[in-house]
Amino acid sequence: MNASRTEKKRERSGRFFLPALQNAGTGPRAWLLLAAALAGLACFAWAGALPSIFEPGLPGWKEKEFAGRTVYTPLPEERLLLAESLGTASGLFFEQPVDVRATPWLNWSWRVENVLSGVNEREKAGDDYPARIYVVAKGGLVFWKTRALTYVWASNEPEGSMWPNAFTSNAHMIAVRGGTRDLGKMLTEKRNIREDWMRAFGEDIETVDAVAIMTDTDNSGQKARAWYGQPFFSAR
């Protein structure tokens, strides 16, 4: 993997959510800029539905491109978002504080057409996933405490496993699904963010500040298709 691609992988490992990164460069500098921008978000917490992911134009969502563009196509009639990656990596993100004391459950559905062959998700060279959903929490003025939790459909890691991202321990990965067993099925997921955060980072959390969706295959050069159902937060 060349140096440029390595840097882009580092940039997106849990910290691509803000427009400030569009021209921020990569690596540690980008991490600090992300944290600084998150620190400037409104301090009130919002609870409710995230913007629709199947409305044409995806209003409310922004896109960050890393290595080519993953094509995200809203499917209003099916109430789904189709993601198609062919050796590409870009993601959609939405910025808004959410009070996870009141609404700790993140809900979504997804369907994956295929997993990736020969990738080791615990290594930098294997940081590709047919489907993933992020939540990120700012560190306030303590920039280096900005952290991300990433729920993934892993290609080779077993379901239920958790590990630090290959590029930074400030992002942890959780394999909600793994392997080929449920390929082609639309599955509904429900995760308690506070419980998962405690397991990953050893601390409680009150607010998350951004949510993101991404299908990426730029490192492996393979292709992936996934369908996402509307994510939302709930009290139970």
Segments from the language model and where they lie:
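Extracellular beta-strand elements of beta-rich domains used
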Residues: V211, Q230-F233
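Extracellular glycan-recognition surfaces and repeat-rich motifs
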Residues: G57-R79
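Solvent-exposed strand-to-loop "edge" motifs in beta-rich extracellular domains
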Residues: S109-V115, K138, R194
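Extracellular/luminal beta-rich ligand-recognition
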Residues: G126-H172
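Extracellular/lumenal carbohydrate-interaction signature centered on repeated Trp-anchored short motifs
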Residues: E95-L106, T180-L183
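Short carbohydrate-recognition loop motifs
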Residues: T73-G91
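Extracellular beta-strand ligand-recognition surfaces/modules
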Residues: D128-I133, S169-G179, L183-R225
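Bacterial N-terminal signal peptides
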Residues: L33-C43
